[in-house]
């Protein structure tokens, strides 16, 4: 059994006990989260439901494992012969989530 969910502008194929890294969600480690935007649902017996755009009555439950930050990305801009340069660093925040189950309501 698996589902395709949409969160943070991206789509993820998830099954029970999967650990996924997604865009930052608010909450501490151990907090329960629910994903309601399910785009596709397939049970183990070959039946598949494809949403237009979402499948109603299906939700994916998960638990926040950790809040982390990605590697530092350096943006460097230089104008030659002008003694002008700018350096900026950026670290993207993301959330690690463990999928606890897929439920049909």
From Swiss-Prot:
Give a GO biological-process term: translation
Q: Does the keyword Transmembrane helix apply?
A: no
UniProt-recorded Gene Ontology molecular function terms:
rRNA binding; structural constituent of ribosome
What keywords are assigned to this protein?
Answer: Ribonucleoprotein, Ribosomal protein, RNA-binding, rRNA-binding
* Function summary: This protein binds to 23S rRNA in the presence of protein L20.
Q: What family classification does the UniProt entry report for this protein?
A: Belongs to the bacterial ribosomal protein bL21 family.
Quaternary structure and interacting proteins, as annotated: Part of the 50S ribosomal subunit. Contacts protein L20.
What is the recorded name of this protein?
Answer: Large ribosomal subunit protein bL21
Q: Name the lineage.
A: Bacteria, Pseudomonadati, Pseudomonadota, Alphaproteobacteria, Hyphomicrobiales
């Amino acid at each position: 059994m698996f589902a395709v969910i949409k969160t943070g502008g991206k789509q993820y194929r998830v099954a029970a006990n999967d650990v996924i890294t997604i865009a930052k969600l608010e909450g501490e480690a151990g907090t329960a989260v629910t994903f309601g935007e399910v785009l596709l649902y397939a049970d183990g017996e070959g039946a598949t439901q494809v949403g237009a755009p979402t499948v109603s009555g299906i939700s994916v439950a998960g638990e926040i494992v950790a809040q982390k930050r990605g590697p530092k990305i350096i943006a460097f801009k230089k104008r030659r012969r002008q003694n002008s340069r700018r350096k900026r660093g950026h670290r993207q925040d993301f959330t690690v989530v463990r999928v606890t189950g897929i439920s049909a309501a």
